[in-house]
Amino acid sequence: MDRDDPWSVTDRSIHDTLAALRDDEANAAVATVVDVEGSAYRRPGAKLLAPADGDALGAVTAGCLDGPVNSLAAGVRDSREATVETFDLTDGEEWGLGLGCNGIIDLLVDPLDDSYDALLDALADHEAATTLTVVRSADAAVPVGARTTVTADGDASGSDRPGVPGDALDALRASAEDAMADGTSGVVTVERESGDLDVFVDGVEPAPELLLFGSQNDAKTVAKFGASAGFRVTVASSRGARADGEQFPDAHRVVATHPTEVADHVRAPERTYAVLMSHNLVDDRLALEALLRDTGVPYVGLMGPRERFGELRDALADDDVTLTQPELDRVSTPVGLDLGDGSPTGIALSIVAEATAVANDAAGGRLREQSGHIHPRVDPSA
């Protein structure tokens, strides 16, 4: 696995590495932020992988807990038992200032074992899932680390680990479904006669897909930035245009397609963000119609000025195709956020920034102009 930059990794890289470690039956621990009080660099659901054979991958803080987390991970790798540790980082003299670490963080550290398999199988199928993990227990029969995974079809999968008790699982069904739909995470308390449980409800979504229709030079930089931002990138070359993995080393798939068949390469419509950049009006028109009519992709970015989109709509009208308002709402043209940079690099950054904002249901504006928390606080029990 690539650990040249083990700290600045995406959720996609974390999931891919989890799968690779499981395939290798590696001895590893996983640290997960389960609860935060006050401010913290990472929110619930953030993960760090700590394999025995090398450096950690990922981050659960801005660096202020590296030593303690590594020590906890080493202990879990030896014991194969999950543990939850609370770190009070409000004491700046003890932990150091200036790192964004001034909240109280609850951290689950557990062994990488078969309890992760149901989640990894779902992600491999481009589906979301929710893991339910007991992080505090007043029931002696239910240990910390007991886990059940709920998948999109409603199945609840167990493992060699103890699972979440059936009565608690029933109480958590709605929270699990909401977390799966939104990709949110948090702790829910389940009151039970045999002892209350605090359960970490961790909704995990597969990586968003960035579909680039076109294989000109400008697509290379968009593919590079898209992969760095955590997208799984597909480059679809139009008609006879040359494109391969060597030309697009950052893409996860490179395919050749007719523009009317570009929808065939959409694997997860609800999480696919398409950009049409073939620089051919006819091909872009055909691809746009296919994506809007044959898929539910929420975002289709179109390169070029507004006038070009007007020409494209006129061409569609000539074929008796009129875009509905819901279809028009899915089109973004000119594509990208206004960064004020017209260079190829600036344009690519603008495109990926907009796709990222749409994928996260964010406006894409300046944080200084927003009120409240930078990241939304989620109550999974609501």
Where do the language-model regions lie?
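Segments forming oxygen-rich coordination pockets for charged ligands
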Residues: 2-252, 269-273, 315, 354, ...
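Short amphipathic alpha-helix with an adjacent loop that forms part of the alpha/beta core around
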Residues: 260-269
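Conserved SAM-binding strand-loop segment of SAM-dependent methyltransferases
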Residues: 252-258
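Adenosine-phosphate binding glycine-rich loop
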Residues: 298, 302-382
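General small-molecule cofactor/ligand-binding pocket signal
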Residues: 234, 255, 332
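Short gly/pro/ser/thr-enriched loop/turn and capping motifs at secondary-structure boundaries
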Residues: 67, 240-243, 262, 306-310
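Thr-Gly-centered strand-to-loop micro-motif
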Residues: 145, 159, 213, 277-278, ...
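ADP-ribose/adenylate-binding Rossmann-like module
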Residues: 236-237, 273-284, 289-315
